[in-house]
Amino acid sequence: SQVWRRVRLRNSETAPLHASMRRAVEHRGLMAIAIGDLGVANSTTVALSALDRGWTLYAHTPTRGVALDETSADESLVAPVWKALAVLHGHQISHGDLRGKEITVDVGDDDATALFGGFGSAEYGATNVLLQADIAALLVTTTAIFGAEAAVRAAIAEFDEDTVLS
């Protein structure tokens, strides 16, 4: 009953994001479609289907672009990454997993476009806390790749200074 008392007296509770693997796969596929409609997904959902034995199929196109990691430290690529995050946040979508392996850059003749993958933690209708967490995570990722000055400068160029530094 001491445990019961602690459970009952908590100020808030975070429910599991997904109740089943099927829901998790569906969520990932649907977020890929929504983010793809904004032009910043690095793959396109091809199929999403429930299968026998409780399995779920999620098929997508091959990933577009080159993974953003320490080997792609060309500072001209940092601005497109922050621009892509601003697109998500402009539609109140948080990514939730902005590590370098989930970000690719598609370099064209005239420009570069940053694209996102790995939407298992993405949220539609994200709270301000989740949006701020994205900014913090992307600051860590872009600082590790491009350096602190370039990362912060690009972040402030897309978002206002108060948003980035708060």
Describe every region a protein language model picked out.
Residues L17-A19, T71-S72, G125:
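Short, contiguous strand/loop micro-motifs
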Residues G108-S166:
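C-lobe/activation-segment region of protein kinase-like
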Residues G54-L57, E102, D111-T113:
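A generic structural signal for beta-strand entry/edge sites
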Residues T61:
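Conserved Hanks-type protein kinase catalytic core
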Residues V25-N42, V66-K101:
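Conserved kinase catalytic-core helix
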Residues A47, V105-V107:
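Conserved hydrophobic "DFG−1" position in protein kinase catalytic cores
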Residues R64-L68, A122-E123:
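A short, flexible beta-alpha/helix-coil linker loop
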Residues S1-Y58, G90:
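Conserved ATP-binding subdomain of kinase catalytic cores across diverse folds
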